[in-house]
Amino acid sequence: MWVGALVSALVWGGAAEAASKVTATKKARPVVQLSERALWRAKSWVGMTTLAKMSSAVTDDCSGMTRLAFQQRRLDLLPDDVLPEENGVTAIHRKARALGMLSDTPTPGALVFFQNTFDRNRDGLFNDGLTHIGIVERVGADGTVTFVHKSGGLVKRSRFNLLQPEARKDAKGHVLNDWLRRKGKKTRGYLAGELVAGFAAVDERWRSPEPPRLASAKLTVKGDARTARR
């Protein structure tokens, strides 16, 4: 009998140990944040000329790319009440402000806003407000930020450096800032660092509340029907 008990203990002990290892593995699995998943998506699109293959529900531009990267169930970067005078960038910025998510510091996965990247109102002046958006990919030791965005018909990587916003390259020839606004008849060309307007984190606070379930409504309807028959 003691032999059987020993074998049973070994078998069940091994099973329990294996089960505990599986449980530990499940517990150790990292949780992927919204910003991490969005950044992974955006990076996978670099080099693409259109978003139409992924979705026809967003505009094929910088705000559409950013929305699509973060899009999940009940999560859209756009507010529910986009105003007639707003573009996608200003609408997203307004929602970020309302949620208290605006920041002056770039972090991987954060939204980055730019102003005056093109002559939106076609008056030749530097007065066009928020006009461009992207997703921060990484922040270098020298302060150079790499971001993913859709510009010029292409999803691409570009750089800016807020410590040296007017410098195209450093002393070693490394690019600090890419060009983001072309030279116009009345304006010079501008580097990305000169046009940064701020950042915004994206987390669960951007997600819309779960809609109320209809079960209670159905019960009420059935109850009313029974009452009516009486």
Locate predicted features:
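Exposed boundary/loop context
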Residues: 6-7, 57, 81, 127
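Aromatic- and glycine-rich peptidoglycan recognition patches
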Residues: 122-230
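N-terminal capping segments
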Residues: 18-81, 189-230
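Bacterial N-terminal signal peptides
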Residues: 2-11
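Sec/Tat signal peptide C-region and signal peptidase I cleavage site
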Residues: 12-18
